[in-house]
């Protein structure tokens, strides 16, 4: 009997649960571990291993695999996703090939994304980096100035990438840098300026070397260089640079060029506004970028031109509901954590999309529109435990009325929606 009591009191050395409270208890020299703690340890190790797995250039995902992943997060832009998938595949294939002793050296191909505000340029670059599991950094071209002037040096872009790679320079040298608002560093006129343009042409000149591939000296703490500090040496030859911008006004340059080429006898007569901006951007040529204000050397280092289209109403509705990180899914989850069910009726989604189009903000403006409606109700829910359902209606969007709210009877509280879930439940959600 004493032996039975002793066995009954055996406990897990990690969580303290007794043998009766768990399925299995495994003994070691003076210690015990239960099946639940083993499962938990396995999950922790698996998660950490997943986070630390480095990208192997030898196992580059195929273009269709890259596009399939982009489809999960980015709605529409089929042409842009295919172009990006092929460009990224070729870039990392080049890294692997150039390591070997071959007769042909493959040149670097950076990417220029052109598209209206809110069309998904930044999201495409972020999603690519996440899929490839490579370090990623975003820089704003408007903050950059030529060396010696107030503002950020171009080397600070590389520092962000090194920091995101946990100062592993070798890992950073296979990363992706996205430079946003690149159209804002266009020079003020097509002709070279006599006066110094430190935030336009000067920045383009400063970016040339790192875009092409060079060993750059980066100050580890950022800021300006001075002769008494040590530098981090990083080779930019294998860093993929993706530059993006709205390029407002370049459509008129394209339109003027195409109109001139179609003049003369037998030319087809087109309505003045027959083509939208997205259709015109598809016809862009390097010469149009030169007229816009980019210098020839800069355009030459961005040989792959990828254009994005303006998002129409149907695309915006899909963006609200379809992707894994869709805004509607995010807000439903936030409400569920407070045991409240959130619904959007079909007309409300149409109204949100129409409002985003009228604001000319594209997908970027969707969150701001929803947040305006949600703010008041999200303030009330935590302190009103009778609210069970919230329905967002068309009137809530267009007329700024309060969403339709359903409550339980006086004296009762709402039932719990959130239940304890296993890791399997979370993964399948």
UniProtKB/Swiss-Prot annotation:
SMART domains: AAA, ClpB_D2-small, zf-C4_ClpX. ATP binds at residues 116-123. Keywords: ATP-binding, Chaperone, Metal-binding, Nucleotide-binding, Zinc. It comes from the Bacteria. GO terms for cellular component: HslUV protease complex. Gene3D superfamilies: 1.10.8.60, ClpX chaperone, C4-type zinc finger domain, P-loop containing nucleotide triphosphate hydrolases. Zn(2+) binds at residues 12, 15, 34, 37. One of its GO terms (biological process) is proteolysis involved in protein catabolic process. One of its GO terms (molecular function) is ATP binding. InterPro entries: AAA+_ATPase (IPR003593), ATP-dep_Clp_protease_ClpX (IPR050052), ATPase_AAA_core (IPR003959), Clp_ATPase_C (IPR019489), Clp_protease_ATP-bd_su_ClpX (IPR004487), ClpX_bact (IPR046425), P-loop_NTPase (IPR027417), Znf_CppX_C4 (IPR010603). Residues 1-53 form the ClpX-type ZB domain. Belongs to the ClpX chaperone family. Component of the ClpX-ClpP complex. Forms a hexameric ring that, in the presence of ATP, binds to fourteen ClpP subunits assembled into a disk-like structure with a central cavity, resembling the structure of eukaryotic proteasomes. ATP-dependent specificity component of the Clp protease. It directs the protease to specific substrates. Can perform chaperone functions in the absence of ClpP. This is ATP-dependent Clp protease ATP-binding subunit ClpX. It comes from Clostridium beijerinckii (strain ATCC 51743 / NCIMB 8052).
